[in-house]
């Protein structure tokens, strides 16, 4: 989960940086276009003013430029055609305020004038601008060879995702992978059924025969055992020696006479016990006494 967050954050950061770079390039291009447009407007105004001045000069000086050399007609006036017959002096009063008459017939061809002086050098033209008005421009537009290609522009925005392509061909089978890591120990299975008894094994080698050794020393005395159950009442003991006469007691109340009991049977002799290693056993005569 943490890796996905880091990868997503890096992707968003890259997109933001790319957007800022693209916006900066667009603003730079817009500023360059604005400067070029202003320069083009200045050059266009200069061309229109120059063209307008030339058009006006054509109406004011129809013979040519204002600095053109004078001609025969401008110095001596146009020659009038001679009337047929005889010359007549026009001494009558001149008309005043009369409308102009119809144009006369074209006159005879004049003499060839002297070659004029070389004209002044023209003004330098606008650098590299397409002239929209070509009226009265000698030779028209100058066709210049194409210039060098400009610098490479910035990369465009990434296009939209194209349609999904078809399924490719099935590739060859990959190599066999190595053995994976050992998995965790599985749960214990159910105990299986008892198997058949196996065949009898081979006969073993004869064992080593040992002779009984000498009896060992008696061990130390063990701890005292727990108290055993109460034994059967023993045989009546021998009469003891007569004791000293006691003090006369207070006479007690007379008791009820008891019944005589039945004498018990004589018990069987017990089996002799094991000999102990720490003390000699007493003789049987002591018990019979």
Curated annotation (Swiss-Prot):
Entry's Gene Ontology BP terms: collagen and cuticulin-based cuticle development; cuticle development involved in collagen and cuticulin-based cuticle molting cycle
Molecular function terms from GO: structural constituent of collagen and cuticulin-based cuticle; structural constituent of cuticle
Regions of compositional bias (Gly residues) in chain numbering: 162-183
Ranges of biased composition (kind: Low complexity): 184-207, 223-239
InterPro entries: Col_cuticle_N, Collagen
GO CC terms of this entry: alae of collagen and cuticulin-based cuticle extracellular matrix; annuli extracellular matrix; collagen trimer; cuticular extracellular matrix; extracellular region
Region (Triple-helical region): 101-130, 147-269
Tree of life domain: Eukaryota
Signal sequence range: 1-18
Entry keyword set: Collagen, Cuticle, Disulfide bond, Repeat, Signal
Region ranges (Disordered): 95-289
Family: Belongs to the cuticular collagen family.
Record's subunit section: Collagen polypeptide chains are complexed within the cuticle by disulfide bonds and other types of covalent cross-links.
Functional summary from the UniProt entry: Nematode cuticles are composed largely of collagen-like proteins. The cuticle functions both as an exoskeleton and as a barrier to protect the worm from its environment.
Protein name, per record: Cuticle collagen 19
Species annotation: Caenorhabditis elegans
